[in-house]
Amino acid sequence: MNKIYPDAAAALDGLAFDGMTIMAGGFGLCGIPENLITALRDTGTKDITAISNNAGVDDFGLGLLLQTRQIKKMISSYVGENATFEKQYLNGELELEFNPQGTLAERIRAGGAGIPGFYTKTGVGTLIAEGKEHKDFNGETYILETGLIADVALVKAWKADKEGNLIYRKTARNFNPMMATAGKTTVVEVEEIVETGSFDPDHIHTPGIFVDRIISGTFEKRIEKRTTRDA
């Protein structure tokens, strides 16, 4: 099966629908699937639930989907870099489900592994725990967290071979590998596509069995904040 598509719009063809749930990799703006996010914006899809560590910035990353009010709900860990998000949330126009960062990562990993839920001490005694099942183990209280899956996972990797085996690069790996396993359909944008067999099997981070569609993208790789000083 050919997994390679000519561009981001083609790779999302037939996948986007109103009310869908997406996962979008990245940590801040590092390792985000910027081409696929732009293509999803251009579909006009509405009422999206977006699972992502961050909400992008005002005019980049998932911030593009917030500008056009295509996102209905965010399941995230940190959203403080986006003024558009703040305004919509405080006006009651956007739903938010906060997760501690480690809990968010484990919920995604669990979803990808077919694990419906797990117990954690993180959040016990805080607002995070409200409405969640509590259970004691060995004299300590834990809360139940559920696994997460998405209709479509949007992933950024460094390289892919033609079978969809992926290699990530440094910090840009972040949430991408676990999200690649947790999408009903996983679409990946990469900086380079190579021939199958080019990778040392020990260097592959995500096996191609998890990957459905691949594009070779062009990347701005914007930096959120840059601090400089005089030499």
Question: Which residue stretches match the model-derived regions?
Answer:
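Conserved alpha/beta enzyme-core scaffold
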Residues: 1-231
